[in-house]
């Protein structure tokens, strides 16, 4: 995987565009789905015939023995059908990951055109007149490099996660009798669908920096590497001892991501929700509990998936899944200042509602992070400036939050039975003052300033100063 960081866009783009495409993966997914349907039908038919025989025509000890063996065979068929569904889901996940990576990869023709332009400019740069144009072209090339690196890293992460879960079909069938209580199975075999007892942690990343590299082109590759590292860390301390599997979706917000060709927020979230759903189905097929952690924009993907699972008759049981949303901007900034259903055209984003869910969910935010904990009295400019600094210091770091760091703010049980518990990671020192600490200003001075400024900042939040005047909630001014 590491070679993606050092390979030029000429290589990474050529690799992606030279591939065979997702057609074979989609065909495999369809074939596995068809096999699963046939196995489920066979199981139902066999069970119906045996039940009818035992209920009407065949009674006694031999009938009961037959029924026990028939139930084992029916269970074998059902378990095999579940495995076939899991294989279909994995193939579809890979197809979606390829499509996302392909869309995010720079076309080789654009890379070649950029290199040709630089060569021409350099060749005619007799008096240095082309130096600014060369620098601009090189900056674009650095962006291409960063864009390809992120695309390939995310694609590799999904492929690695899928590959880790795949096992030989013959081995799975051999282990089915033991799973179903058979007597002639090898007790040393591993579990059917999970070779490790480690719980899976599906991570859903926040917005990608792939296009933002135009702002800082020469560190684009470092941004890509930092983003990939952060994505595997999301929820690592909230669910310790779990194995991360990253959902590789576009994670862009239209032109605000730094490119006219970037996918808008609604499309990114929709793609992410579909990919997350496939990951959940594949992971829960093992019978092991699964955790899901989303950071920032990833928390919005989780909310869309929770809403879908709430109406899905085939959703996994409530005991199979646990969610955590970290530094979510929708439950924070968006739902503070905008009514649900409001669309922001420049981002292609429509504000969603917090869904009812059958699953237990933790909502975690860092105090004074403007994305997840904005001041609901925006006319308090000091609170606003402090919250901007809070985002810079705390937003991404919320990915590493642990339960013992949080203060429980609220716990609400929905009509579907799931409890949503909100936690705040407190910041004793105002983010506005953290730069002073970093440059070595004595603690007693910083502490004194904190004591003076904190009440003024907290007046910008109705939760800290409920009697300090009106405030915004869901886009409405509350008096």
Swiss-Prot record:
**Where along the chain is composition biased (Polar residues)?**
187-202
Residue limits of the PE-PPE domain? 240-462
A biological process from GO: response to host immune response
Pfam families cross-referenced by the UniProt entry: PE-PPE, PPE
Q: Where is this region: Disordered?
A: 180-203
Which GO CC annotations does the UniProt entry carry? plasma membrane
Give the protein family.
Answer: Belongs to the mycobacterial PPE family.
What the entry lists under PANTHER family is as follows: GLUTAMINE-RICH PROTEIN 2
Q: Name it.
A: Uncharacterized PPE family protein PPE63
